[in-house]
Amino acid sequence: MSVMLVDDLTLIKKLGKGVFCEVYLTSKQGSKERYATKKIDKKFASNPKAKKYIDNEITILKDIDHPNIVKLYDVKETSQFFYLVTEYCNGGDLSSSLEDYQDKYNKPFPEEIVQYLMKQIVSAIRYLHKKTILHRDIKLDNILINYDTEEGQRKNNLLKQK
């Protein structure tokens, strides 16, 4: 039996928890497409500063379209929560990927992969800056990897071969 998170979103599993939200892996009922759905408690949003932060995040995500920035697909709302339905990045965060690779192979990421990742990160930052958007929390934990793209699959296979 599937558990509904909100509307037509089926809960698959909890991915993580932040200061003011929880993130779930979800799918639309009857679809194999997967999403990362951020569930934000409206109690947090009752603080004007927090509400402004949430509104800004939604406005920015709706306005941007770049292959290296997570896409916002939908915003849902109930009496208790806001739900931001975004692209799911199945590779996790860069910090964990670096640690896992180091643990498994006892060496750092191959230089070719580092160069590839840096190119993608710089491309995303350049895009945001051209739109006069400043990301104030760039860190390895906030850089997500998606292996579902053709390029992502090639890089993942390369990592496994090194």
Residue positions per predicted region:
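Conserved N-lobe ATP-binding subsite of Hanks-type protein kinase domains
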Residues: 22
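Conserved short submotifs of the Hanks-type protein kinase catalytic core
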Residues: 80-93, 97
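AlphaC helix of the protein kinase catalytic domain
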Residues: 95-109
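Activation segment signature within eukaryotic-like protein kinase domains
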Residues: 117-118
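A short, aromatic-enriched beta-strand patch in the conserved N-lobe beta-sheet
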Residues: 74-75
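Conserved N-lobe loop of protein kinases adjacent to the ATP-binding glycine-rich P-loop
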Residues: 27-34
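Conserved N-lobe beta3->alphaC-helix segment of eukaryotic protein kinase catalytic domains
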Residues: 34, 39-64
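Catalytic-loop of the protein kinase fold
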Residues: 129-146
